[in-house]
């Protein structure tokens, strides 16, 4: 089924090539029989016998030493939105960097000469994959002529994929019909190749939208149309291809919006298959899209896809739903109540009967009215790691492929959410170390309390090889507890609001500034409304309030900067990786001054070409502090015998502080930007 909206006739031409014809334009791909005979196939995954042997070997190896290395935990994947075709093909909009994306197949864009490194996409591929990728691509040049529209297949080398499809994409040429047709055929070839080689997932970056000038909105419309068409008319019912990913870079708002618009257009005529989370909604009801405001996270742990997202577990469509309940299996509150009420009275009655009989640490009932096959009821107060391990083993024994569970024990049982997140992921790692090719493919934690999303994300990052990657997440606006005095953001995640002179808010900030900077002239004061940064800061504040057993952890401080840094700080906050730009005397963190006069120095708030200077008024979580020293990269421990209990910040003088240094990016929120002149 094609996505709504007009497309040039060439893009959906009834005379499009057949799958067999399409395959002739792919260097490195032979027929199924040919692949089985081919001794030197570029992709072992394409040879069924080799693939089975590889699996047996992998299984023996894992069973022999029972080791599970960190490399088996792939990068966290930021899923902005997802939809499913009526034929069951899952489409996901992914935000991130191509270097840290994982899938069976990833598509790359290459020039006519097939030399990697010319554009940002192929340069990124070459950077991570290594020189062998170029060597394999050079070998493929001898098999197929180099012309626009052809694709060349290589292995993934050091990328987190089994294969790369390198496409020679067309120039936009002001929308010439041939450009549409060539790009459409490239997409068809990629989908057909994945189908023929029995891969299960493919990731499409926005190829052609850089120097080749394909408009992003046009590309989004075209590729979704082709994928829908493939799903409805070409893809077999038993197809191994289960997921198609559309990748946009983290800060590419235009590309993200283009896909969200197309997702929404399609979902309006297929509402039962849509899963496009909107502002103020965690159930996927379609509304007007402005920017993504909900996030699910995914990462690969061995053969398991681990997901975490806020939502209602009672609406999950999976094989197994886990109900975290009391030891007596009769709790009817919170998430457990939602599950039992959704399942129906018959399930509740059966649960009571089974609870009265001898049973294991959990009991199993049918799914009832829920969209699952069974419900596993577990006591939330028990050891979470052991409980989750038991659930996963039960799913595997029954050959189920998917399970959704809550953040077990974080409700009435009162367990520490950080410990729970670690325990759940540890259990999945344990399971993956024992099962190299399990039936169970997807484990999802559905979070009722949105504030737990960051906690699970932090736990995932501990196992993420690319933890240094700066993912900007998106959250439901209703979960951010935005300040009441903020201007309506119209579902946007970020905006700047200029304060009017004479307003009480303006006067408060002005007075704080002029207390030590009376000789400077204020040009304007702007309030920074950044929902994501505010959410991250508030989560950190709540953690610190609990840890220190009081709420007196916050100060309003100053930070001077240059004009070039302003856009970055407004959008992303203070990044300690920039530490050392102006000061490192008390540690390699971000520095904030008690008095505005300190930050007003030209060393810190460097004047721009027009003489304007810039200073932030910042909420900073200073908490419990101590004196800093050069070389610190984190605050020192409060007690040398307990190295994990750190001070929250450091200062120049504990009795009379003039400045504070923090070492974690979400420990400061830039609330106001003052533009001034000397």
Swiss-Prot record:
This is Protein mono-ADP-ribosyltransferase PARP15. It comes from Homo sapiens (Human). One of its GO terms (biological process) is negative regulation of gene expression. Its main location: nucleus. Belongs to the ARTD/PARP family. The keyword NAD applies. It holds the Pfam family Macro. SUPFAM superfamilies: ADP-ribosylation, Macro domain-like. It is found in: Nucleus. It catalyses: L-aspartyl-[protein] + NAD(+) = 4-O-(ADP-D-ribosyl)-L-aspartyl-[protein] + nicotinamide; L-glutamyl-[protein] + NAD(+) = 5-O-(ADP-D-ribosyl)-L-glutamyl-[protein] + nicotinamide. Residues 1-19 have a biased composition (Low complexity). Substrate binds at residues 312-313, 324-325, 331, 335, 409-413, 449. GO terms for molecular function: NAD+ binding; NAD+ poly-ADP-ribosyltransferase activity; NAD+-protein mono-ADP-ribosyltransferase activity; NAD+-protein-aspartate ADP-ribosyltransferase activity; NAD+-protein-glutamate ADP-ribosyltransferase activity; nucleotidyltransferase activity; transcription corepressor activity. Residues 1-67 are annotated as: Disordered. Mono-ADP-ribosyltransferase that mediates mono-ADP-ribosylation of target proteins. Acts as a negative regulator of transcription. Residues 78-267, 293-464 form the Macro domain. It is an enzyme of class 2 (transferase). Its EC number is 2.4.2.-. Disulfide bonds: none annotated. GO terms for cellular component: cytoplasm; nucleus. Residues 482-678 form the PARP catalytic domain. Keywords: Glycosyltransferase, NAD, Nucleotidyltransferase, Nucleus, Repeat, Transcription, Transcription regulation, Transferase.
């Amino acid at each position: 089924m094609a996505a709504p909206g007009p497309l040039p006739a060439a893009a959906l031409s009834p005379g499009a090539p057949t799958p067999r014809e399409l395959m002739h334009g792919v260097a490195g791909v032979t027929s199924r029989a040919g692949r089985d005979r081919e001794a030197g196939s570029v992709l072992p995954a394409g040879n069924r016998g080799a693939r089975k042997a590889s699996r047996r070997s992998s299984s023996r190896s894992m069973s022999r030493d029972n080791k599970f290395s960190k490399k088996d935990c792939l990068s966290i994947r930021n899923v902005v939105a997802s939809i499913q075709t009526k034929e069951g093909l899952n489409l996901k909009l992914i935000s991130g960097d191509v270097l840290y994306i994982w899938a069976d197949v990833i598509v790359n864009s290459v020039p006519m000469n097939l030399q990697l490194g010319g554009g940002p996409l192929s340069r990124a591929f070459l950077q991570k994959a290594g020189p062998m990728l170029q060597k394999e691509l050079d070998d493929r040049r001898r098999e197929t002529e180099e012309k626009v529209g052809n694709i060349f297949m290589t292995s993934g080398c050091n990328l987190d994929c089994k294969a790369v499809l390198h496409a020679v994409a067309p120039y936009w040429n002001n929308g010439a019909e041939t450009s549409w047709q060539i790009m459409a055929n490239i997409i068809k070839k990629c989908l057909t190749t994945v189908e023929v080689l029995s891969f299960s997932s493919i990731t499409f970056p926005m190829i052609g939208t850089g120097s080749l000038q394909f408009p992003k909105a046009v590309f989004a419309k075209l590729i979704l149309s082709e994928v829908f068409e493939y799903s409805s008319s070409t893809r077999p019912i038993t197809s191994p291809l289960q997921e198609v990913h559309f990748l946009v870079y983290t800060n590419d708002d235009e590309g993200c919006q283009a896909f969200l618009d197309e997702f929404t257009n399609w979902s309006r005529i297929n509402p039962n298959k849509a899963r496009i989370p909107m502002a103020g909604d965690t159930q996927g009801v379609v509304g007007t899209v402005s920017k993504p405001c909900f996030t699910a996270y995914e990462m690969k742990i061995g053969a398991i896809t681990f997901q975490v997202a806020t939502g209602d577990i009672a609406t999950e469509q999976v094989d197994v739903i886990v109900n975290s309940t009391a030891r007596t299996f009769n709790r009817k509150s919170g998430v457990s109540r939602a599950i039992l009420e959704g399942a129906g009275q018959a399930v509740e009655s059966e649960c009571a009967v089974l609870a009265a009989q001898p049973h294991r640490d959990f009991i199993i009932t049918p799914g009832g009215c829920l969209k699952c096959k069974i419900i596993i009821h577990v006591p939330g107060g028990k050891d979470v790691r052991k409980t989750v391990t038991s659930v996963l083993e039960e799913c595997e024994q029954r050959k189920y492929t998917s399970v959704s569970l809550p953040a077990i024990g974080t409700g009435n049982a009162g367990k520490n959410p950080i410990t729970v997140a670690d325990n759940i992921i540890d259990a999945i790692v344990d399971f993956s170390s024992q099962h190299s090719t399990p039936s169970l493919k997807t484990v999802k934690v559905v979070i009722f309390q949105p504030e737990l999303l960051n906690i699970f994300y932090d736990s995932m990052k501990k196992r993420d090889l690319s933890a240094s990657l700066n993912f900007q997440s998106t959250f439901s606006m209703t979960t951010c507890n935005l300040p009441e005095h903020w201007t309506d953001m119209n579902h946007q995640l970020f905006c700047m609001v200029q304060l009017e002179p004479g307003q009480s808010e303006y006067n408060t900030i002005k007075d704080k500034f002029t207390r030590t900077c009376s000789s400077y002239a204020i040009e304007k004061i702007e309030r920074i409304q950044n929902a994501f940064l505010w959410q991250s800061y508030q989560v950190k504040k709540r953690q610190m309030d609990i840890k220190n057993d009081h709420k007196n952890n916050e100060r309003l401080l100053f930070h001077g900067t240059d004009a070039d840094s302003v856009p970055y700080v407004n959008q992303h906050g203070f990044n300690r990786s920039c530490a050392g730009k102006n000061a490192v005397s008390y540690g390699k963190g971000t520095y904030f001054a008690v008095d505005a006069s300190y930050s007003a120095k030209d060393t810190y708030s460097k004047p721009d070409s027009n003489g304007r200077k810039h200073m932030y008024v910042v909420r900073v979580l200073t908490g419990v502090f101590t004196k800093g020293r050069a070389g610190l990269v984190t605050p020192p421990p409060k007690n040398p015998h307990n190295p994990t209990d750190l001070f929250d910040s450091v200062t120049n003088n504990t009795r009379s502080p003039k400045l504070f240094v923090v070492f974690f990016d979400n420990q400061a929120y830039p609330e106001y930007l003052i533009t001034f002149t000397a």
